[in-house]
């Protein structure tokens, strides 16, 4: 998929009424905490793979310094349940998250462009 410039964090989407984009980054407190965090993130993806919620995209990267970057796109309307945050696995991910990580930098993002193929 390729897309042009968007100057807002929420814009109309063909897949849903509004497309929210959020980027979060945080450092892990230790390599062990990063490993635990990764296992919990993998469980979120396993649940999303089982439940297959529509109108949502989610990408998590573990960087070489054991920090994490989460990028999410949600096509739900304001006031509707976030399909990622409403999973049991995400609740488990959130449990103790403050002890596993440092300060979170979380920002709404504007999509400038995207080219997507199969990611492994």
Model-derived regions, located:
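Glycine-rich beta-strand-turn "strand-cap" elements at beta-sheet edges
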Residues: 1-20, 27-28, 56-67, 90-120
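Short beta-strand-to-loop capping motifs
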Residues: 25-30, 72-76
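Onset of an N-terminal alpha helix
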Residues: 17, 38-41
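An amphipathic, aromatic/His-enriched active-site/gating alpha helix that lines ligand/cofactor pockets
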Residues: 43, 47-56, 73-108
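Short, surface-exposed ligand-recognition loops at beta-strand->loop->(often short) alpha-helix junctions
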Residues: 27-39
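A short local loop/turn or secondary-structure capping micro-motif enriched for an aromatic residue
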Residues: 31, 77-80, 115
């Amino acid at each position: 998929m390729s897309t042009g410039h968007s100057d807002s964090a929420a814009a109309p989407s063909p897949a849903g009424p509004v497309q929210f984009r959020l980027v979060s980054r945080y450092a892990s407190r230790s390599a062990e905490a990063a490993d635990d965090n990764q296992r919990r993130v993998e469980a979120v993806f396993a649940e999303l793979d089982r439940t297959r919620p529509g109108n949502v995209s989610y990408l998590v990267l573990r960087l070489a310094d054991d920090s994490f970057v989460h990028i999410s796109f949600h096509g739900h309307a304001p006031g509707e349940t976030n399909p990622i945050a409403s999973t049991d696995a995400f609740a488990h991910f959130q449990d103790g998250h403050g002890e596993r990580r440092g300060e979170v930098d979380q920002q709404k993002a504007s999509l400038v462009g995207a080219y997507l193929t199969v990611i492994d």
